[in-house]
Regions:
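Conserved interdomain linker/interface between the two RecA-like ATPase lobes of SF2 helicase motors
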Residues: 81-144, 148, 155-160, 263-264
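Conserved segment of the helicase C-terminal RecA-like domain
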Residues: 56-72, 214-217, 221-254
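Conserved helicase motor
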Residues: 1-10, 17-24, 139-142, 160-172, ...
Length: 270
């Protein structure tokens, strides 16, 4: 169910809907599963939280799913009002790709001359030589045109596009990436979650920009390594200087991998 659906609702044992549709229900569901609970529009939306509570039967249950719980959920967990369980391994049983940090001093100054740092170009070329595709995340929409111009010089024979939240062709470009029509996409954080492209590498230029929260960086890193055929994709963050959100993202991935390794080794954990 969603806002543009024309067919009327009818009872079913399983209902898949947007969280806004929960406003239509009262004590209707035995169990609710809310995916990406930390993401817009659900996060920090009091009306949707109220709708969730109203839609569940009095003795019903609710399961929140997220890779990056926000502060409110963490407080609920710490105070033992929520029970937490970890799924540190993906379906293929491999650890999450580790985040690697590389320095790219003055990349914006180079960008003004329609250039990118040599180490960035070399890394992207290496991925393409290996026969892999990639996502290149950048901080701001205003950076897209300059990054595209810089990439055209070094990647003239490759197929790529830029994409952002207001792009009228966003869905078509994402589908072309899925279909293999693009070798890479240059994107803002709009593709940080909710999309899966097999066997890709992930790069972030300017990962120390304040626009990227630690949770956003974890989600971005999570675009890599999702396929059974290549579960170890490369993740590289280029920064101007050390910053808290990058360090927090690295720590969270390492924490989950420690839990994942214990699971692989057959050791129980809490």
């Amino acid at each position: 169910m969603h806002g543009r659906q024309e067919l009327p609702y009818h009872y079913a044992q399983l209902t898949i809907c947007t969280t806004h549709q929960l406003l239509r229900f009262y004590h209707a569901f035995d169990n609710l599963i809310i995916d990406e609970v930390d993401a817009f529009p659900y996060a920090a939306n009091a009306s949707l939280l109220y709708a969730t509570k109203q839609a569940i039967k009095e003795n019903g249950g609710c399961l929140y799913l997220t890779a990056t719980p926000g502060d409110a959920l963490l407080r609920e967990i710490k105070s033992k009002r929520l029970v937490v369980n970890y799924l540190p391994l993906r379906y293929h049983g491999h650890l999450l790709p580790q985040i690697k940090v590389r320095l790219a001093f003055g990349w914006r100054r180079r960008l003004e001359r329609q250039q990118l740092p040599p180490q960035v170009i070399q890394q992207l070329q290496e991925t393409l030589r290996e026969g892999h595709r990639f996502l290149l995340f950048i901080p701001h929409i205003a950076d897209l045109a300059l990054v595209e111009a810089a990439l055209r010089h070094s990647f003239a024979t490759f197929r790529f596009a830029t994409v952002h939240a207001s792009d009228p062709e966003r869905l078509e470009k994402v589908q072309k990436m899925r279909d293999g029509d693009y070798d890479f996409l240059v994107t803002t954080s709009i593709l940080e979650r909710g999309v899966t492209f097999p066997e890709i590498d992930v790069y972030v230029l300017g990962a120390d920009d304040p626009v990227f929260s630690s949770s956003a960086l974890v989600q971005i890193a999570g675009r890599a390594g999702r396929a059974q055929s290549r579960p170890t994709g490369r993740v590289v963050f280029w920064i101007n200087c050390n910053c808290r959100q990058v360090n927090q993202a690295i720590s969270q991935v390492k924490y989950l991998n420690r839990k994942g390794q214990r699971l692989i080794d057959g050791v129980s954990f809490v």
